[in-house]
Amino acid sequence: MASEINLFYFEKFIPHQPNIIFQGDAVVTSKGKLRLTKTEDGEPVYQSVGRALHITPVHIWDSKKTKVANFFTAFSFTIHAPDVNKTADGLAFFLAPPDDKPKQGGGYLGLFNEGEKAPVVAVEFDTFINKNRDIDDPNPLHIGLNFMSIKSRATVPWVFENDSEAVVFISYDGSSKALDATLVYNNTTYFSLPTQVVDLRDALPDWVRVGFSAATGQSDPEFVETHDVNFWLFASCYKDDPATLAKTLTGINPDLA
C-alpha cells in the first residue's frame, strides 16, 4: 500500500529555482514571480510557450490500482494583457508523465499537439475562444477541465480581470474521484467548475509531475499576455482527504483560510 506524502510551498520564486523544472520560455522575474511566457522589454510576445513543473514526482495511484491519492493545491496567478480585447491564450495547472515535454502553443497551451489524445489532466484558465475543431471552445472565456484532450470535458464561464490576482483552489478526492476547482478575485468574486467525477487511473501513469503551462497567441502578434504565478502550495497523500490537506496548507499560509 502506497504511503507517499508530497508537500511543498513556494511563497515566492527565485531565479533558477531549485526543485523546479523550467521548460520553454518559463523564467523567474526579479520580483519573484514565475513567468511562464516570454516578454521583451517588459511586454509579452506571441508564439511563446512555457511550463514549470515540480521536480519531485507524485505517486498518484498505487501499483495495484487499488487506491488513488488525494491532492489539494492552491496558487495565485496574474495575467497582464496590453489590450484586454486581444487576450490569448491562457494558462493551466496540470498533471502529466514525469518525462512529458512542451507541446503545441496557442490554444493547445503547451499541453497537447493537434489531434492528440495524451496522458494529461489539466484545469485550464482560457483567455481566447478558439473554434479550432480540436479545441472547440465555448463562449465566453472559461475555466475548463482537460482530460486527455485539449477539448474541455467541462467548463464554467469566467469573467477575466486584467492585472488582478486570481487565487485558485483545486482538490481531488481519490475515493470519490471528485475534482473541484475554484478561482477567486479579491475574496469576493468566485468562479467554480462543477464537481467532476474522473478516475485519474484512466488518464495518467502511477507517477506524475505537477506544474503549470501557458501560451500566447500563435498567429497574430497583438494577441498576447503575460502569465505570472505568484505563489504555489501543493499536498498529496493517500491517508488524508482533500479537506484535511487544505487545512494543512492554510496552516502554512493563513491568508488562504
Enumerate the language-model features and the residues they cover.
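Polar, low-complexity loop segments and adjacent catalytic/binding residues used for recognizing
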Residues: 1-257
